[in-house]
């Protein structure tokens, strides 16, 4: 049995789906407020639901019964949308409990090491780094291309419009969440000890580079606007809750760029990663609103 936390987010769902496709038993911890459509989508994979809060010992024991490993996606590139939650106390309780048990493998996906803008995601990453867990794998995932190159984050490619954060010239090694989920699964069964891996895409590209890729694919010129660094900082400063602040913090980091982390090798888990060029080629583009 594999316990997956953060199953209400895009990455957590993909981990559950892939594990079930391999015939693996999966227990998915989900928040009680999870939207019905996500519940049904996750239920269709055949996972075992575990909606109980993890703040008390009885719930933790029940969640970890017959579990061989935990894959935690709570502190990854969240929130994808405002409806998602991040229960830091539950995440901490589970991590500490698996450490006490000693025999469980703990695999956590979190934000890159270079991120410095304070948020619950960065704080959780730092706690993972400081945890003396006997069998822990930390996966530092770069920006998810499926999230940041979407209309919800200002990249409205179906209508050839792009709102770039900052000057758009800073490079990031964007990665597919599908590749991240596959690497997390391939880490299962690894021997004890602490391992850290950087999950970066194969290319360091700026937001302006990405716009050019889409313009070439669509044969259209994008209308490009920019959100200044001052405006991004103001959004962060006025954030009223941890989730909103985490979203604003990620925008600041996106504007700064996040090139590949050359100090942490991924060679021990060979996988042909999705390039941005390949990702763009797979997208279906809606026709322009004013087309005949």
Task: Place the predicted regions along the sequence by residue.
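Oxidoreductase cofactor-interface core, primarily capturing Rossmann-like NAD(P)-dependent enzymes
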Residues: 1-41, 49, 55-65, 75-84, ...
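Glycine-rich anion/phosphate-binding loops
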Residues: 84-92
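NAD(P)-dinucleotide binding in Rossmann-like oxidoreductases
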Residues: 225-227
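A hydrophobic C-terminal alpha-helical subdomain
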Residues: 18, 187, 229-292
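Short, acidic/polar
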Residues: 95
């Amino acid at each position: 049995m594999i316990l997956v936390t953060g199953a209400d987010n895009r990455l957590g769902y993909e981990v559950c789906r892939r594990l079930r496709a391999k015939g693996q038993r999966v227990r998915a911890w989900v928040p009680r407020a999870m939207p019905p459509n996500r519940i049904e989508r996750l239920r269709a994979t055949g996972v075992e639901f575990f909606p109980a809060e993890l703040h008390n010992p009885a719930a933790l024991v029940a969640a970890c019964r017959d579990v061989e490993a935990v894959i935690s996606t709570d502190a990854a590139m969240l929130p994808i949308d405002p409806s998602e939650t991040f229960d830091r106390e539950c995440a901490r309780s589970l991590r500490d409990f698996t450490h006490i048990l000693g025999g469980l493998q703990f695999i956590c996906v979190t934000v890159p090491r270079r991120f410095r803008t304070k948020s619950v995601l960065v704080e959780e990453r730092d706690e993972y780094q400081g945890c003396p867990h006997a069998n822990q794998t930390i996966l530092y995932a770069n920006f998810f291309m499926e999230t940041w190159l979407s209309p919800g984050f200002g990249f409205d490619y179906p209508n050839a419009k792009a709102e770039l954060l900052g000057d758009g010239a800073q490079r990031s090694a964007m990665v597919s969440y599908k590749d991240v989920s596959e690497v997390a699964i391939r880490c299962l069964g690894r021997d004890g000890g602490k391992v850290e891996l950087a999950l970066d895409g194969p290319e360091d590209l700026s937001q302006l580079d990405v716009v050019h890729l889409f313009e070439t694919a669509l044969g259209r010129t994008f209308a490009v606007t920019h959100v200044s660094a001052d405006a991004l900082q103001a959004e962060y400063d006025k954030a009223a809750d941890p989730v909103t602040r985490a979203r604003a913090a990620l925008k600041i980091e996106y504007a700064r760029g996040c090139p590949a982390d050359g100090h942490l090798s991924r060679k021990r888990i060979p996988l042909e990663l999705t390039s941005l060029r390949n990702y763009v080629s797979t997208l279906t583009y809606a026709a322009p609103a004013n087309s005949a």
